[in-house]
Design a protein with these regions (language model features):
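Alpha-helix capping and helix-loop boundary segments enriched in small/acidic/polar residues
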Residues: 279-281, 292, 324, 378, ...
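Bacterial N-terminal signal peptides
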Residues: 29-42
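Exposed, low-structure sequence patches enriched in small/polar residues
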Residues: 383-385, 391, 467-468, 481-848
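Sec-dependent signal peptide cleavage junction
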Residues: 44-55, 840-848
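Bacterial N-terminal signal peptides that target proteins for export
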Residues: 3-32
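Structural preference for beta-rich elements and adjacent junctions enriched in aromatics
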Residues: 47-441, 450, 822
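Extended, well-ordered alpha-helical scaffold/bundle regions in very large, multi-domain proteins
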Residues: 302, 308, 316-317, 331-333, ...
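Outer-membrane beta-barrel transmembrane domain signature of Gram-negative proteins
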Residues: 237-259, 410-481, 514, 601-647, ...
Length: 848
């Protein structure tokens, strides 16, 4: 029905004949979707009869020492969970190695004791690594826990044989992807003995959220990885054919009269910085202090707040030269905005880098100066005053998330060079960011969610400073066997101005198909209006789009010959511009991947756009009145990697592109990344990535007297990245990362004027030099010492150099020498944070 509504809203009735074909396609798509829904909810009984195992927790009244030995009598009284089943490589057969897991509990914590039997204990891998580094060369044991047993949300506590801790959140919506930015405070110890190795875990109830009930019934599963033979097994069987691991949890029984504790913790910090810029005198100093607060409002809901935060030690961004019409999206690296944000990722309308990001008018300031005025100060970042999160889930499965943050007003300073008069220009007002999420779990790992974001800027509204709001929903429904699913979503964006009409935009999406089993297929529909804009608090690369796609895939999960598993798929898509309604592209993509029994993997992707693409975004016109017709093109991508458990690991990527046009557009890219484990303490990896585009056609800023200008250029990008880590212990490590990015766009002097039919004609007037030679060099060296649970000392050295000019430097050595002659920023910082937990204080006072 939504499809017909969109058709009826076409702005020009005279164009209806033009859209008849499109309308028929929409009707056919709706019919196809209806038929698919019939099959979807009839379902199949395959895989639905999997019986859950049950493990029993035993209450202990004695003290449990976390030493990795399991010598307390209580451990012998607990009933072991055994009979693990292989996940990789032979899914579904008994594990080659015996494993026993016992569970104890008391009023404060859950205790897990696991014995991993191994006839070759001297061959157990024990590489050291940083906390949350889950892919180190070591044997692993982990437990997945879902206190609400909803099949949708849970926590993972993982430990290596070398006692490196990894913890993360897991959800069914991300399949096997997990949020490894979550850091809980828990304890573990491991030992290696003549029979194998032992892991002992203590998980305080303060690290979990669970319902207030006399009898607890939790979802649980245990996993083991034997690294040297790459065998992974689980206690409760997990099939590869559908769903994520959280959909295959067993059950934990026996826990009675356990009360959710008062969860209250403080993490105060102090930090200091020394900074020097080579072409400026003196050394700058600064000192900061603040705290993070965590409060359990109820047994299921937690408030997280950060007051006067300091994110100066986060890893430097991988900056790039951007020749496209789209904004570059950088990953979030600030801990507060990465931890406990699973609910806020719903609907894809929250991009936390907007908070404390670049001021709206940071570039416009230079156009706001008067005669004889120069900009003397123009901050590139907005100051964050505070941020708060409230999140949790009720016993009925309703998840609630509330986020709020306040950023300070930001001012640029301008000075008159003749009179000396100074004035300030506001580049960003005091701003409040808010998000509300409601997420209801349903049967069969299904859910429905509604979300809302709002950005309220203080002061007088204008074209730049306005109030923005986005309301959205999404829903996922699965059949009882989890083989078929359907999802739908939509959003409405609103911008409120004082002196202009409210700007409204909308977005909708629909997907249905067979998403489990060996053969898979689905249909996707997406519609985004030309006015849909969630970017005040979210990130959207581009709007104004309608897309249809159908995907067919076939996967194998059982080994045959030397092949462990395969994945193949065909994707056919058809895309249009929403306004004005017009064809943009059609493509077909073939994808194949295989994993060998020696854990080498290879993938091949082939893409075709047989009719080319009408690109309405490259001309940079707001009204989409012009487009550039990109010629038919072909792309081939190849990837391969070796067994990561070996001392030397290699990853290779290669790509070739060719367009059929008079300009001879073609290009290639490749990357090679060797990783070497010199010892169980020291490892390093190096990556070189090269991309070359020949006779590339792109937009050029020039005098618009002849119209929109395009130019022909060769674009070369070379990126070198070196990373290394020396691990003193599981709580102390030194890391180093250096990255040099060099990109140059070399125009050959051929410039063109864009025509109304998307073609190009030779430009007759001159164009200024458009060449670009851009460099970014960043070095981050970090020493981390986790001196107590949840407490940390970090010492960081950063070096950054940037250069950009219109002179192309041909030689790599000459380019690097020129870069080193530019001003460098060096900083050294020390930060200490200390974890204070109410439960620990309560135990101390209770013992007295």
């Amino acid at each position: 029905m939504n499809y017909r509504i969109e058709i009826s809203l076409l702005p020009d009735p005279n164009q209806m004949l033009m859209y008849t074909g499109f309308r028929n396609r929409i009707t056919a798509a709706a019919l196809f979707s209806t038929i698919l829904f019939v099959f979807l909810f009839q379902g199949s009984a395959m895989g639905a009869g999997q019986e859950k195992k049950r493990a029993t927790a035993t209450r202990t009244s004695g003290q449990v020492n976390i030493d990795g030995r399991l010598e307390e009598p209580s451990w012998q009284e607990a009933v072991p969970a055994t009979d693990f089943v292989i996940y990789n490589p032979h899914n579904g057969i008994p594990s080659s190695y015996r494993t026993e897991v016992r569970i104890l509990y008391d009023d404060d914590a859950l205790y897990i004791g696991a014995i991993m039997f191994d006839s070759k204990p001297d061959s157990i891998y024990t590489e050291l690594g940083q906390r949350d580094e889950g892919d180190i060369n070591a044997d692993h044991f982990w437990v997945e826990i879902s206190p609400f047993n909803d099949g949708l949300n849970g926590e993972v506590f993982k430990v290596s044989a070398s006692n490196v801790q990894i913890d993360n959140k897991m959800t069914t919506s991300e399949s096997w992807e997990r949020h490894d930015t979550w850091d809980a405070v828990w304890d573990s110890r491991t030992t290696v003995n003549d029979n194998g190795w032992v892991a002992e875990l203590k998980i305080p109830y303060s690290a979990l959220r669970f319902p207030r009930s006399a009898t607890q019934l939790w979802g649980i599963n245990f996993w083991r990885e034997v690294r040297r033979i790459r065998e992974t097994s689980s206690w409760n069987f997990v099939t590869k054919e559908f769903g994520s691991s959280i959909a295959h949890l067993g059950e934990l029984t026996g826990m009675r009269d356990v009360k959710p504790p008062l969860r209250l913790s403080l993490v105060p910090y102090v930090s200091g910085y020394l900074e020097h810029v080579t072409d400026e005198p003196g050394v700058g100093t600064s000192y900061n202090g603040g705290l993070d607060l965590k409060v359990g409002l109820t047994e299921s809901f937690t408030l997280d707040a950060t007051l006067i935060p300091d994110f100066g030690q986060v890893q430097s961004d991988d900056q790039v030269l951007n020749l496209s019409p789209y904004e570059v999206k950088y990953n979030e690296k600030r801990p507060f905005f990465m931890e406990g944000t699973e609910l806020f990722n719903k609907g894809d309308i929250f991009y936390s880098r907007r908070i404390g990001g670049t001021p709206h008018l940071v570039r416009a300031v230079y156009d706001m100066t008067g005669e004889n005025e120069v900009v003397t100060r123009n901050p590139s970042e907005v100051s964050l005053l505070n941020a708060t999160k409230i999140s949790g889930r009720t016993s009925g499965g309703l998840g609630i998330g509330i986020f709020n943050a306040v950023t300070n007003s930001t001012w640029a300073e301008v000075e008159n060079t003749v009179t000396g008069e100074k004035r300030r220009i506001m580049t960003e007002p005091l701003t409040n960011y808010n998000m509300l999420v409601l997420d209801q779990t349903l049967k069969n790992d299904s859910y429905v969610s509604v979300m809302n974001t709002s950005v309220i800027r203080a002061g007088e509204d204008s074209e730049d400073f306005y109030t923005a709001n986005v309301s959205a929903f999404e829903a996922l429904v699965k059949t009882s066997d989890r083989l078929w699913s359907a999802s739908a979503g939509g959003a409405l964006s609103q911008k409120y101005y004082t002196s202009a009409p409210t700007a409204l935009g909308h977005f909708m999406t629909f997907n249905a198909g067979k998403t489990g089993g060996k053969f898979r297929t689905d249909y996707n529909f997406m519609l985004m209006s030309d006015t849909y804009d969630p970017n005040d608090m979210g990130y959207l690369r581009r709007n104004n789009e309608i897309s249809h796609s159908v995907d067919f895939g076939y996967n194998t999960y059982e080994p045959f010959g030397n092949i462990m598993s395969t994945r193949t798929s065909v994707d056919i898509s058809y895309d249009q511009l929403y306004m004005p309604r017009a064809f943009t592209s059609a493509s077909i993509e073939l994808d194949g991947m295989l994993i060998l029994m020696n854990y080498w993997s290879f993938s091949l992707n082939l893409g075709f756009t047989p009719w080319g693409e009408d690109d309405y975004f490259e001309p940079r016109t707001r009204d989409m009145s012009m487009y550039y017709h990109r010629p038919p093109a072909f792309e081939a991508r190849l990837r391969g990697d070796t067994d990561k458990s070996k001392r030397l690991y290699l990853e290779f990527n290669g790509e070739y592109m060719k367009a059929w046009s008079d300009y001879g557009q073609h290009g290639y890219s490749w990357s090679l990344q060797p990783e070497f484990k010199a010892s169980r303490r020291f490892s390093f990896d190096y990556e070189i990535a090269v991309e070359k585009m020949f006779n590339d056609i792109g937009f050029v800023e020039a005098d618009p007297v002849e119209g929109i200008t395009f130019g022909k250029r060769n674009v070369t990008t070379v990126t070198n990245t070196l990373s290394g880590a020396f691990i003193f212990s599981s709580d102390s490590y030194l890391t180093l990362r250096g990255r040099h990015y060099w990109s140059k766009a070399d125009y050959d002097g051929s410039y063109y004027t864009l025509q109304a039919d998307g073609s190009l004609s030779d430009r007759t007037s001159d164009v200024d030099n458009s060449d670009v030679n851009s460099n970014f060099l960043n070095i981050d060296m970090v020493y981390t010492w986790r001196f107590a649970p949840g407490s940390e000392l970090s010492l960081v050295w950063k070096n950054s150099i940037w250069s950009e000019g219109d002179v192309i430097i041909r030689s790599g050595l000459d380019n690097f020498a020129d870069l080193l002659s530019m001003p460098q920023t060096n900083s050294i910082s020390l930060k200490i944070l200390y974890y204070l937990d109410y439960q620990n204080f309560r135990k101390v006072f209770r013992s007295k």
